[in-house]
Amino acid sequence: MNSIEFPLFDRTTKNSVISTTSNDLSNWSRLSSLWPLLYGTSCCFIEFASLIGSRFDFDRYGLVPRSSPRQADLILTAGTITMKMAPSLVRLYEQMPKPKYVIAMGACTITGGMFSTDSYSTVRGVDKLIPVDVYLPGCPPKPEAVIDAITKLRKKVSREIYEDRISSQQENRCFTINHKFRIRRSTHTGNYDQGLLDQSPSTSTSRIRPSENFFKYKSTVFSHELVN
């Protein structure tokens, strides 16, 4: 058994009889049986793949990658999460049995990374979709940092109390947002259609007259409207 900061057992007698509680016994059994579901979308996941080799050998922590969320109790997200992928990620998290944990790996997963400035389709942080237990910053994080995150998660598991797990499971901490993306095409003369011209902007009181043109040149123009 790997060493943990706090002991799990109350005391050990000379007759090799261990006295403990059901809560500590449950935590001890889950320490060496974290089965992760690997949810990698970009380059950060390549760093996690190096943990499978003999140099780092994450099998010593009892990590057994699973391909089904119903057999996993840990999901490791690595890479950019788009709005189209968000419902699938939430569905995978909801299908995992309880108790379950989440590790957010990389800057793109935590904050959206370099895509969070002007991208309309990037989720600004996976914690807006599912609760995160350990944040692992970096672009990308090193394999040693991934092992450190797993160690910190195991310490958190060793301190858990059964009553706290029940209360946290009753809370609805994850949510989804329906994003509708509409595409309207203008005429080839550079003028928007009549419906768009008749609409008044939400931040201004003046109306746009149908005779006004947004573009003076003749080209094919597309109007993108993102409705939250």
Swiss-Prot record:
<keyword id="KW-0521">NADP</keyword>
<keyword id="KW-0150">Chloroplast</keyword>
<keyword id="KW-0813">Transport</keyword>
<dbReference type="GO" id="GO:0005506">
    <property type="term" value="F:iron ion binding"/>
</dbReference>
<comment type="subunit">
    <text>NDH is composed of at least 16 different subunits, 5 of which are encoded in the nucleus.</text>
</comment>
<keyword id="KW-0520">NAD</keyword>
<dbReference type="Pfam" id="PF01058">
    <property type="entry name" value="Oxidored_q6"/>
</dbReference>
<dbReference type="InterPro" id="IPR006138">
    <property type="entry name" value="NADH_UQ_OxRdtase_20Kd_su"/>
</dbReference>
<dbReference type="GO" id="GO:0015990">
    <property type="term" value="P:electron transport coupled proton transport"/>
</dbReference>
<keyword id="KW-0793">Thylakoid</keyword>
<protein>
    <recommendedName>
        <fullName>NAD(P)H-quinone oxidoreductase subunit K, chloroplastic</fullName>
        <ecNumber>7.1.1.-</ecNumber>
    </recommendedName>
</protein>
<keyword id="KW-0874">Quinone</keyword>
<dbReference type="GO" id="GO:0009535">
    <property type="term" value="C:chloroplast thylakoid membrane"/>
</dbReference>
<dbReference type="GO" id="GO:0045271">
    <property type="term" value="C:respiratory chain complex I"/>
</dbReference>
<feature type="binding site">
    <location>
        <position position="43"/>
    </location>
    <ligand>
        <name>[4Fe-4S] cluster</name>
    </ligand>
</feature>
<dbReference type="GO" id="GO:0008137">
    <property type="term" value="F:NADH dehydrogenase (ubiquinone) activity"/>
</dbReference>
<feature type="binding site">
    <location>
        <position position="139"/>
    </location>
    <ligand>
        <name>[4Fe-4S] cluster</name>
    </ligand>
</feature>
<comment type="similarity">
    <text>Belongs to the complex I 20 kDa subunit family.</text>
</comment>
<keyword id="KW-0004">4Fe-4S</keyword>
<keyword id="KW-0408">Iron</keyword>
<dbReference type="GO" id="GO:0009060">
    <property type="term" value="P:aerobic respiration"/>
</dbReference>
<comment type="function">
    <text>NDH shuttles electrons from NAD(P)H:plastoquinone, via FMN and iron-sulfur (Fe-S) centers, to quinones in the photosynthetic chain and possibly in a chloroplast respiratory chain. The immediate electron acceptor for the enzyme in this species is believed to be plastoquinone. Couples the redox reaction to proton translocation, and thus conserves the redox energy in a proton gradient.</text>
</comment>
<keyword id="KW-0479">Metal-binding</keyword>
<dbReference type="GO" id="GO:0051539">
    <property type="term" value="F:4 iron, 4 sulfur cluster binding"/>
</dbReference>
<dbReference type="GO" id="GO:0019684">
    <property type="term" value="P:photosynthesis, light reaction"/>
</dbReference>
<keyword id="KW-0411">Iron-sulfur</keyword>
<keyword id="KW-0618">Plastoquinone</keyword>
<dbReference type="GO" id="GO:0048038">
    <property type="term" value="F:quinone binding"/>
</dbReference>
<keyword id="KW-0472">Membrane</keyword>
<feature type="binding site">
    <location>
        <position position="108"/>
    </location>
    <ligand>
        <name>[4Fe-4S] cluster</name>
    </ligand>
</feature>
<keyword id="KW-1278">Translocase</keyword>
<dbReference type="InterPro" id="IPR006137">
    <property type="entry name" value="NADH_UbQ_OxRdtase-like_20kDa"/>
</dbReference>
<feature type="binding site">
    <location>
        <position position="44"/>
    </location>
    <ligand>
        <name>[4Fe-4S] cluster</name>
    </ligand>
</feature>
<keyword id="KW-0934">Plastid</keyword>
